[in-house]
UniProtKB/Swiss-Prot annotation:
Key words, A-Z: Acetylation, ATP-binding, Cell cycle, Chromosome, Cytoplasm, DNA replication, DNA-binding, Helicase, Hydrolase, Nucleotide-binding, Nucleus, Phosphoprotein
Record protein name field: DNA replication licensing factor MCM5
Subcellular location: Nucleus; Chromosome; Cytoplasm, Cytosol
Modified residues (N-acetylserine): S2
Binding site residues for ADP: R371
Catalytic activity: ATP + H2O = ADP + phosphate + H(+)
Self-association and partners: Component of the MCM2-7 complex. The complex forms a toroidal hexameric ring with the proposed subunit order MCM2-MCM6-MCM4-MCM7-MCM3-MCM5. Component of the CMG helicase complex, a hexameric ring of related MCM2-7 subunits stabilized by CDC45 and the tetrameric GINS complex. Interacts with ANKRD17. Interacts with MCMBP. Interacts with TONSL; the interaction is direct.
Motif Arginine finger mapped to chain: 512-515
Assigned protein family: Belongs to the MCM family.
Highest rank taxon of the organism: Eukaryota
Gene3D superfamilies: 2.20.28.10, mini-chromosome maintenance (MCM) complex, chain A, domain 1 (3.30.1640.10), Nucleic acid-binding proteins (2.40.50.140), P-loop containing nucleotide triphosphate hydrolases (3.40.50.300)
EC code: 3.6.4.12
């Protein structure tokens, strides 16, 4: 985005030779007359329903509201005058100016008489819209220069709104000769000031070279903003970097989008000077080199964070097919089987992923707050259990999917970063993975390898579904309405049954934000191993010959469209019976009644927190959404409770999530408190002691070693003690 304000641009008028030539002027007048005719006479409706003059009425309404713009559809212009539409498509810069002049004249006619004090006619901005198929940034070549293009993409950064002169006045420093009302070309093109004063007369001292300066108070300006557009992730060929394009917006197109928005833009593919910086010691070579940008003439925001951008392209035949599919009694099992069918087993995990893809319903409360509808899922366990394969499949299957690995992801890369714009030297904001995945799924592999500081950055994005930024004078909030699917290994590589909760090295705050946590173990079972080996061999043998989906599975393309359709068209709520049932089960689980004891095989006071109750509601809504039903039934609640039972509760009851918010047994909690009290009595503030001797002393008192280490770990996290001398000695701070 550098060099757009470089003044060294020269241009010529493409309407014939001399700009003042009679032929060129006559042609301009004729085209302007035809544009005016279109705006005045284009009408919609039939003889039976009556006609309305679409653009004439719209101009009048907008002008009276103080909004000096109008949106013209290219299809309307083509149906009225095909030649005119062709001219506008091939030479948009020249013809748009005529269209805006025509719109100004029509506005003058339809708004007369205007009230006193408002006699001055305002300029009208014309925005363009088209139903034509969009192109890609990759196919923009030199033959499309100065043509009208339609490009989809994601806005990744936006500059502040600034002023650009449209008409300037200049004055000579020597003789004070003034030239007024000099028109500037729109876009990122500058203006080259005259080198000589045109008032040089005999007998007067000669004016020096470059005598003119701009008079800012006599210039007419408009707002403008520069944006950075990145091509859509699904349009990027495998292994290549996504391409970017600079956009120029002015007047009413400013501040229409924020980073993270998926948009389709109509604009003129233009060029600006390359802008090499001579101060860096490089010669200004490459006279003919120009960098490209798009002068935006219309913006359509494609999504509001629910994946609707894909649902709009569903044909009536596909809609009918999706309704038939949703009405099938076994649709839940069918979708679960279709999730990564090449992976053997793990049906409960696949069912949970199916719920994550469809998601619950986002709710806006009367006080203005929102409750998230997206489901977050964590898979913990042994290597070689196809966790990463499932993540890769979800990225391909989700209407909007972003895949990232924990080790290669920083806090700024996941949320948002503030960088300095090289051209204006101002700070601008660029959205990260969770902003770009707004309305979709973020898949984070190697979640355990992330630095703790980076992991903390996504806390807000996971629960509140916003990302708040306060950096370099920029204070704002971006949307990140996305699900998080994360995969992690245990601390010891493989899951160690004897270590219990020590297998997990996550803070309670992050674990409680996951609706479901699956412990995936590679268990040794001869019968299962035989079936797994047979499945893998079959895959390898038939990999080349099998190109179509197996019967009883939905193929990937149809599944992607079905998910987008369900997310866009259905927002189920709990039925009264289902809500009553869930309330009763919640009370039973909270009170540790007989049912809960039977499920856990031991008496345990593990409460299910409100956050987990909301998770069950979301899972039930997702199950209902698959069937396109407006209400979640008791059966949906039953299945949601079962999924929660086999994931998070099973992990909690086996002691694997001990220490997590709401997931520690009463006796364990009491033991941890006893160890901590004794430790603080024996370990004075300001003293230091060997960690090995502490563990040995407490082990002699029959305390389990993992409990002692857990207490030390908690005190380290709270900052009460710290390691010294290569982690051999502990020093007490408070």
């Amino acid at each position: 985005m550098s060099g757009f304000d470089d003044p060294g641009i020269f241009y010529s008028d493409s309407f014939g030779g001399d700009p003042g030539a009679e032929e060129g002027q006559a042609r301009k007048s004729q085209l302007q007359r035809r544009f005016k005719e279109f705006l005045r006479q284009y009408r919609v409706g039939t003889d039976r329903t009556g006609f309305t003059f679409k653009y004439r009425d719209e101009l009048k309404r907008h002008y009276n509201l103080g909004e000096y713009w109008i949106e013209v559809e290219m299809e309307d212009l083509a149906s009225f005058d095909e030649e005119l539409a062709d001219h506008l498509h091939k030479q948009p810069a020249e013809h748009l100016q005529l269209l805006e002049e025509a719109a100004k004249e029509v506005a003058d006619e339809v708004t007369r008489p205007r009230p006193a004090g408002d006699e001055l006619l305002q300029d009208i901005q014309v925005m363009l819209k088209s139903d034509a198929s969009p192109s890609s940034i990759r196919i923009l070549k030199s033959d499309m220069m100065s043509h009208l293009v339609k490009i989809p993409g994601i806005i990744i950064s936006a500059s502040a709104v600034r002023a650009k002169a449209t008409r300037i006045s200049i004055q000579c420093r020597s003789c004070h000769n003034t030239l007024t009302n000099i028109a500037m070309r729109p876009g990122l093109e500058g203006y080259a000031l005259p080198r000589k004063c045109n008032m040089d007369q005999a007998g007067r001292p000669k004016c020096p070279l470059d005598p003119y300066f701009i008079m800012p108070d006599k210039c007419k300006c408009v707002d403008f903003q520069t944006l950075k557009l990145q091509e859509l992730p699904d349009a990027v060929p495998h292994g290549e970097m996504p391409r970017h394009m600079q956009l120029y917006c002015d007047r009413y197109l400013c501040d229409k989008v924020v980073p993270g928005n998926r948009v389709t833009i109509m604009g003129i593919y233009s060029i600006k000077k390359f802008g090499l910086n001579p101060s860096k010691g490089r010669d200004r070579v490459g006279v003919g080199i120009r960098s490209s940008y798009i002068r935006v003439l219309g913006i359509q925001v494609d999504t509001d964070g629910s994946g609707r951008s894909f649902a709009g392209s569903v044909s009536p035949q596909e809609e009918e097919e999706f309704r038939r599919l949703a009405a099938l009694p076994n649709i839940y099992e069918l979708i679960s089987k279709s999730i990564s069918p090449s992976i053997f087993g793990g049906m409960d995990m696949k069912k949970a992923i199916a719920c994550l893809l469809f998601g619950g319903s986002r709710k806006r409360l009367p006080d203005g707050l929102t409750r998230r509808g997206d489901i977050n899922l964590l898979m913990l366990g042994d290597p070689g259990t196809a966790k990463s394969q499932l993540l890769k499949f979800v990225e391909k299957c989700s209407p909007i999917g972003v895949y990232t690995s924990g080790k290669g992801s920083s806090a700024a890369g996941l949320t948002a970063s503030v960088i300095r714009d090289p051209s204006s030297r101002n700070f601008i904001m660029e959205g990260g993975a969770m902003v770009l995945a707004d309305g979709g799924v973020v898949c984070i592999d190697e979640f355990d390898k992330m630095r703790e500081d980076d992991r903390v950055a996504i806390h807000e994005a996971m629960e509140q579904q916003t990302i708040s930024i306060a950096k370099a004078g920029i204070t704002t909030t971006l949307n990140s309405r996305c699900s998080v699917l994360a995969a992690a290994n245990s601390v010891f590589g493989r899951w160690d049954e004897t270590k219990g909760e020590d297998n997990i090295d996550f803070m309670p705050t992050i674990l409680s934000r996951f609706d479901m946590i699956f412990i995936v173990k590679d268990e040794h079972n001869e019968e299962r191993d035989m079936m797994l080996a047979k499945h893998v061999m079959t895959l390898h043998v038939s990999a080349l010959t099998q190109t179509q989906a197996v019967e009883g599975e939905i193929d990937l393309a149809k599944m992607k469209k079905f998910i987008a359709y369900c997310r866009a068209r259905c927002g189920p709520r709990l039925s009264a019976e289902a809500a009553e049932k869930l309330k009763n089960r919640y009370i039973i689980m909270r009170s540790g009644a007989r049912q809960h004891e039977r499920d856990s095989d031991r008496r345990s006071s593990i409460p299910i927190t409100v956050r987990q109750l909301e998770a069950i509601v979301r899972i039930a809504e997702a199950l209902s959404k698959m069937k396109l039903q407006p209400f979640a039934t008791e059966a949906d609640v039953e299945e949601a409770l079962r999924l929660f039972q086999v994931s998070t509760l099973d992990a909690a009851l086996s002691g694997n999530l001990s220490g997590v918010e709401g997931f520690t047994t009463q006796e364990d909690q009491e033991m941890l408190s006893r160890i901590e009290k004794q430790l603080k009595r024996r370990f004075a503030i300001g003293s230091q002691v060997s960690e090995h001797s502490i563990v040995q002393d407490f082990t002699k008192q029959k305390y389990p070693e993992h409990a002692i280490r857990k207490v030390l770990q908690l005190m380290l996290r709270r900052g009460e003690i710290q390691h010294r001398m290569q982690r051999k000695v502990l020093y007490r701070l408070k």
